[in-house]
Amino acid sequence: MLIQCKRVYFPAEKDDGYRVLVDRLWPRGIKKAALIYDEWNKAITPSTELRKAFHSELIDFNHFAQQYRAELAQQHQEGKRLADIARHQPLTLLYAAKDTRQNHAIVLAEWLREL
């Protein structure tokens, strides 16, 4: 199972496989017609409240990841669908966050690998 995370601002590559935008909000500066993606999946993104708490630094990344995983547990079927895709082809999770080490796509990728 190959699941990778990639900033939405980086160019699409042949080996990206199935590309899923996993941000609730459309990325700034990207035209919808210009982005190469297979689906925009808002169902598996962090809630607005959780996203705002993390971005305003009211909670640290570990607390964010813990709460996000609790939210993801409510989206088990959607997670299984994406994990099944990843079993047959590469799955690329697209995100806009600047931090490439501490963001929701990393947490999501880990969760999907466990399904």
Summary of predicted features, one role per range:
Residues 1-115:
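Residues lining hydrophobic/aromatic ligand-binding pockets adjacent to catalytic sites
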